[in-house]
């Protein structure tokens, strides 16, 4: 290559094309000037665009290695507190949720206590203990019978053997002692707040405790499969010996036990006046779906006016009789039986 020189000679300049001369001057100018830092960085970026990508991958790999070395330290994620998180904290402060009460479980616990007492042969009477076990077995049989047959079949069964009904109620009373509360007390308080001389039908009354408590304030008629005392009228709950529209209030307190629930609700509607109240109290664990159960009753000619749960164990419902009946056998009127496990 020859030495670089400027084109200053006029003769030389005449023989060199103008376009080529301009390119040569620009090249000489750039070669003599020092490039700026920004220009050099731009050139580096153009020449090595893969460098940043390699650095990012290396940083990610280093973070992953650090995380594997310290697995106990979770990554710190800063997020705004949601309402669901606050609700969860509140629930934790309240403590563990109460278990739903089931009569069959309470009955099993009662029998376990009896077994513990029987474990001491020096104090327990073997004959009395054998009788107690026999009565417990008969109670389980009678309880299952009531939940798995119709009201008319149960009425005929106890009509032939009234002593079986006494044994059942004695066993039921023993189970009630283990319950944390009883909805019957709530119903009695509710009746005491009502105006005097209401016509009240207590269906499946047992020993007619409502008539005993508020019999002077209201006109109480107590019905059950067997009359255990003078206050009770024996009958089938689906065929009440009463006229149409003769009751202001009809009560089913833990007494919807047969398989023909539709007949029981229809009979309650028949004897109620328009605007009369149907009061139902049942064990919460028996409901397949509380919503569907209430909707089924409303379709049978009622309007729901009140519903609440009593200490997670019992459900209290209140309906008013209306004129229109949408369906005679609507879907959803189902209750699970309370069956006590055999031991």
UniProtKB/Swiss-Prot annotation:
Main location: nucleus
Compositional bias ranges of the Acidic residues kind: 112-123
Biased composition regions of type Basic and acidic residues, renumbered to the chain: 7-33
Stored InterPro entries: RRP8, RRP8_N, SAM-dependent_MTases_sf
Biased composition (Basic residues): 45-59, 89-101
EC number in record: 2.1.1.-
Keyword Transcription regulation among record annotations: yes
GO molecular function annotations of the record: methylated histone binding; methyltransferase activity
Transmembrane segments: none
Top-level taxon: Eukaryota
GO BP term, pick one: regulation of transcription by glucose
Sequence similarity: Belongs to the methyltransferase superfamily. RRP8 family.
Function noted in UniProt: Probable methyltransferase required to silence rDNA. Involved in regulation of antisense ribosomal siRNA production. Required for the N1-methyladenosine modification of 26S rRNAs.
Name used for this protein in its record: Ribosomal RNA-processing protein 8
Gene source species: Caenorhabditis elegans
Gene designation: rrp-8
